[in-house]
Amino acid sequence: MMKASELRAKQVEELKSTLMDLHREAFSLRMQKATGQLSHFHRIRAVRRDIARVNMVLAEKGGKV
């Protein structure tokens, strides 16, 4: 889990890169869940919340989401 204070220290480009990585991870977790291979269901919720945090910080910095 990332803290908002850690995210605020990053540049907009780094945040966008982090956001893309999180979206990829969320997709992968959804596919694992659909195929029955997912063992850590809590990761889905944690990744969704991390995506929300990154989007919030991007909005604060004025970077388009």
From Swiss-Prot:
It comes from the Bacteria. One of its GO terms (biological process) is translation. Keywords: Ribonucleoprotein, Ribosomal protein. CDD domains: Ribosomal_L29_HIP. One of its GO terms (cellular component) is cytosolic large ribosomal subunit. InterPro entries: Ribosomal_protein_uL29, Ribosomal_uL29, Ribosomal_uL29_sf. Pfam families: Ribosomal_L29. GO terms for molecular function: structural constituent of ribosome. The keyword Ribosomal protein applies. Belongs to the universal ribosomal protein uL29 family. PANTHER family: 60S RIBOSOMAL PROTEIN L35/50S RIBOSOMAL PROTEIN L29 (PTHR10916), LARGE RIBOSOMAL SUBUNIT PROTEIN UL29C (PTHR10916:SF0). This is Large ribosomal subunit protein uL29. It comes from Methylococcus capsulatus (strain ATCC 33009 / NCIMB 11132 / Bath). The gene is rpmC.
